[in-house]
């Protein structure tokens, strides 16, 4: 294939070196600021009157065809209306269960219930009636996130967060009316709810998302974690732990499990074990069975929290002492809220569960919308769940976990097209064609830069940052390079998934994995960002990426799942048969080889009501 001249044909992808582009950007920003100040005072809004940043006359005129195209083919989604946090995922009596936050009446947040769906294989889902809804004073504003615990063959309990009329938060109990029912259709709330209120010193709307983290078999006691914060300290995120034997009476442990200053409210807190060596290395460990591991030195514990201040899921690897109620990070510089993320994009409120069927841990996270509420109402639904991912310890780096689409996703692959040995010259693009529609696909790609080219580069972009360095349009010595998906023919619409390599004066290399949404749509009433972070690339490894494109969702995984980035894309032209895939190399100093690119068409899954 012949590479095409990116500078002459596609100036939006990058026609200038980085410094000149930044200087031009600064001039544009200054002009925009001056114009904004003139309009601000001319319109008399300096008094503090709130102004809607998206004016009605700026809303994009979406057509029914465009909106219908956005609905995904193989992601978990509601049949209609709104969803957010996953809750209580589990495997029970032959069925995978997923509960989720759901407004069954409208395509926006409010009137939150627990939606409920079941599956035999984690990819085809049947939606059941709502499990529980807001029908008591303690949950009248919503039945919010929580968890499910299978206590015994005769008892399955649900712990959920309730919101009062004034949005005070409490922890509440419901139980499966018939534990012998594999579908768990009916739930009964406890007569004496709430079972927990925020303890002294905790604000009444900063207390939520109960989740079991350990079972002390010798004392028949469950340890339940609840997320919170303490603003009397330093805007500190904290994890509180309660002990219970019967889920009706709870005792708060006197010390917090862990806390981190200046990160704000912790939501959806989890602690779970990962094997670091030994026979369980490639399998998961159940929280309730971790004490059966003979050599505890082969196990680490992940602490994860969803940061309410910024809506990202952070995690860290460390040591868990359940008796002393203490979790300690291996590395304080990458503690929870300041270090590692599961995903740098639109992925939040994640929950994991142990799958006894395949001895694995699976993580769910919800993917919200970034368009206007008006558009969501018009299309009749909003938000979805990310692809279920397996979670394993990364034995090669020893510093992170790997999250990767579950193996069942490969069963959706259909026709495949292979490309190999494509040289992508500096400042060029290469269209990948002849594989059918490009909006419901699975891509695996590997790139290399010659060792000689890397060694010849003295220093390159040591201060690079995905979110603030200009995205795929800004050219550097060793990047960006990667793929453009959901692209139209002239590349005025595309989402770029790419690597960017920085080199220090000492010869050290840092690889950034980024996803640029800024040209994903010509619509102007959606949020478009550049997301991403650094990712370990070890000696001898290629730059490897997997991208799952499912209409308006793009989930990308770098280096076998060491990091990932999820984006919502709402193209106006690059839809249906107009969607394209390109390779690109916007580096100024090196050519890049696409050693291997494999693209599969993906089948759709069943996602509809259960037929009784």
Curated annotation (Swiss-Prot):
Modification note: Might be processed in two N-terminal and C-terminal proteolytic fragments.
Transmembrane helix in keyword set: yes
Bridged cysteine pairs (disulfide): 466-514
Cytoplasmic side, ranges: 1-24
Induction: 6G-FFT activity is induced by high sucrose under continuous light. Both 6G-fFFT and 1-FFT activities are strongly inhibited by HgCl(2), AgNO(3), p-chloromercuribenzoate and SDS, partially inhibited by CaCl(2), MgCl(2), MnCl(2), FeCl(2), CoCl(2), ZnCl(2), SnCl(2), CuSO(4) and EDTA, and activated by sodium deoxycholate, triton X-100 and tween-80.
Positions bound to substrate: 82-85, 101, 109, 144-145, 208-209, 267
Temperature dependence: Stable up to 40 degrees Celsius for both catalytic activities.
GO biological process: carbohydrate metabolic process
Vacuolar side: 46-612
Alphabetical list of InterPro entries matching this protein: ConA-like_dom_sf, Fructan_Metab_Enzymes, Glyco_hydro_32, Glyco_hydro_32_C, Glyco_hydro_32_N, Glyco_hydro_beta-prop_sf
Residues annotated as catalytic: 85
Membrane topology classification: Single-pass type II membrane protein
Subcellular location: Vacuole membrane
EC numbers, comma separated: 2.4.1.100, 2.4.1.243
Record field: pH dependence: Optimum pH is 5.68 for both catalytic activities. Stable between pH 5.0-6.3.
Segments passing through the bilayer: 25-45
Glycosylation site residues: 111, 216, 230, 465, 586, 603
Catalytic activity of the protein: [1-beta-D-fructofuranosyl-(2->1)-]m+1 alpha-D-glucopyranoside + [1-beta-D-fructofuranosyl-(2->1)-]n+1 alpha-D-glucopyranoside = [1-beta-D-fructofuranosyl-(2->1)-]m alpha-D-glucopyranoside + [1-beta-D-fructofuranosyl-(2->1)-]n+1 beta-D-fructofuranosyl-(2->6)-alpha-D-glucopyranoside (m > 0, n >= 0); [beta-D-fructosyl-(2->1)-]m + [beta-D-fructosyl-(2->1)-]n = [beta-D-fructosyl-(2->1)-]m-1 + [beta-D-fructosyl-(2->1)-]n+1
UniProt KW keywords: Disulfide bond, Glycoprotein, Glycosidase, Hydrolase, Membrane, Signal-anchor, Transferase, Transmembrane, Transmembrane helix, Vacuole
GO MF annotation, one: 6G-fructosyltransferase activity
Pfam families noted in UniProt: Glyco_hydro_32C, Glyco_hydro_32N
Keyword Membrane on entry: yes
GO CC term, one of those recorded: vacuolar membrane
Protein family per UniProt: Belongs to the glycosyl hydrolase 32 family.
Described function: Involved in the synthesis of fructan of the inulin neoseries. Catalyzes a self-transfer between identical oligosaccharides of the 1-kestose series.
Protein name per UniProt: Bifunctional 6(G)-fructosyltransferase/2,1-fructan:2,1-fructan 1-fructosyltransferase
